[in-house]
Regions:
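Nucleotidyltransferase catalytic core that binds NTPs
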Residues: 1-173
Length: 174
């Protein structure tokens, strides 16, 4: 939830798509995230904003005077610098002029941890490539019933063809 009482949370989903690192298209990502987190489904923003600047402009145009952006720990410094550098500046991305811009980390992952704590999108993609549904399922929230469908969608979007077990062949025709 928002850091300040009465704050509204918006979740902006990446529009990026490529077979290797971002296999799902935007609409599919939004649909899966809404299913994974039904309590926050209305907070998942379907906005054309594709960059941090476009997100900031979108929020400013909605009347927000202050923002707290939560991002991966590896992006905090970069996003804080960029958002503050262009705050109050008319540029090609548009204009935003917030009283306060704060960028905070979504938290650090322990890559060596087991289960959800150590899970990452990279590990989930790797499990999908390896055909390891059980490991893939460790990366989805408890209660999410479409893990196998998500797994198949990720594999398909990565260009991985499903293999069917045809059984053993022990007799040959001449």
């Amino acid at each position: 939830q928002g850091k300040n009482a009465g704050s509204k949370m918006h979740v902006f989903v990446s529009h990026s798509q490529d077979a290797k690192k971002n296999p799902l298209d935007y609409k599919r990502k939004v649909a899966y995230i809404r299913k994974m987190f039904p309590k926050y489904a209305k907070n998942i923003t379907t906005d054309k904003a594709k960059t941090i600047f476009e997100v900031a402009v979108s929020l400013y145009n909605r009347g927000y005077k202050s923002i707290v952006m939560v991002v991966g720990s590896d992006r905090v410094d970069e996003f804080e610098r960029l958002l503050n550098e262009y705050n109050g500046v008319q540029s090609k991305h548009g204009y935003y002029g917030f009283d306060n811009v704060e960028v905070v980390s979504a938290g650090d992952r322990d890559p060596d941890a087991e289960g959800l704590e150590g899970m990452s999108a990279s590990k989930m993609r790797s499990a999908a490539v390896d055909g390891d549904l059980d490991s893939f399922k460790q990366g989805v929230p408890d209660g999410f019933n479409d893990a196998e469908k998500l797994y198949r969608d990720v594999r398909k979007s990565m260009g991985i063809r499903e293999e069917k077990d045809m059984g053993e062949m022990d007799t040959y025709e001449k």
